[in-house]
Amino acid sequence: MKKSRWLRWVSAGAGMLLVGSVVAPIAFSGTAGASLGTPPTQGMKPPTSVGAGEGKLNIIAWEGYTQPQWVKPFETTTGCQVNVKYAGSSSEMVSLMANGGGHQWDLVSASGDADLRLIYGGDVKPINIKLIPSWSEFEPFLKSPSFNTINGYHYGVSFEFGPNILLYSTKVFKTPPTSWSVIYSKKYKGQVTIPDNPIQIADAALYLESAQPSLGITDPYELTQPQFNAAVNLLKAEHPLVKKYWDLASQEISLFQNGETVVGAAWPYQQSTLVAAGAPVASTIPKEGATGWADTWMLAANAPDPNCAYKWMAYMSTPKIQAEDAISYGETPANKLACPIMNTLQKGGCAAYHANAPQSYFTTIKFWKTPLSTCDNGQNDCVDFTQWQQAWTQITG
């Protein structure tokens, strides 16, 4: 079983681990957050240079982001001993980062559904992007994305990303489906798989944006109450069709391998694993587009080891490390120069994870961001993430 992003929505009890001993988851939304006022830490001045390492680095991360093969060389080169706590969800990350990391944590590998909570909670602070040399090699849309850059201030450096794809059986679908409508179709009752995650409400909203234009949805993460209700009702109607709300990639892989499901929302990792095993599956991004995740290394407001943190962010942004992580984790690197290295690690690895896709591919993805009550237009009539969580419990219960 691959241990990685798929544990995000599973309760995790992992404690502080010494990484060296560890064996081991677009149309952009403008300047999200700009209308919410000034983040509490915007005035904290980032350093102009990186000094000597403090000798240690404490990280909160998704399991799989701190593999020994790239952590050990970092420790040897910098003298920064890496310690990590693996978090099981974005909400757990936000909780652990309370009070600016509590003078304990230095960095967190936050996803888009946590970024704004951390930024506006005052738990992370701006960084000097000029101290990350490889940032210039990033995909343009990940240099200053709205989910981690507010009012021109960078609250972290983008890392890896990926889309939520429509995975389907080629035995059942002789021609590729063109719409997300298939996962809401009674024709496939009991044969649909869906991620067990409240952010799935955004996927429903994205579909409704074109399926029911009268709702006026323009951003699947900024929903008024009527728009939110429509998405929730769609997902409640879908419930009898769902074979499994999956929280591990291995669960969805097994269902497709066994022929128990024929269509579902997935990530590139599931597809590549199934194809490698000879399963008759393919994927597409439907006409409505897709949601997706993008992770960011964010610096704790009260980080006790900022120099080691900057050294880590710079190291993890290099093509070699991004390529290794992408292949190990099953996602797409932010650094464009990682593509050829991915192919040396896994034949066809670059194409398998869309690292060489044209910009038109990336513009079909709406990346996760935290649903807040204050909409991007300044109105306070959007449904916040707490209500998303409550609704998801009702949908899946």
Residues covered by each model-derived region:
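Paired acidic/hydrophobic, glycine-rich loop segments that form the ligand-binding mouth/hinge
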Residues: 105-109, 245, 262-267, 282-283
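Conserved C-terminal helix/tail region of periplasmic/extracytoplasmic solute-binding proteins
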Residues: 363-397
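Extracytoplasmic ligand-binding site segments that recognize negatively charged/polar headgroups
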Residues: 60-61, 65-67, 92, 104-105, ...
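Ligand-binding "clamshell"
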Residues: 118-127, 150-153, 273-285, 349-350
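Extracytoplasmic/periplasmic substrate-recognition and gating elements
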Residues: 266, 275-328, 397
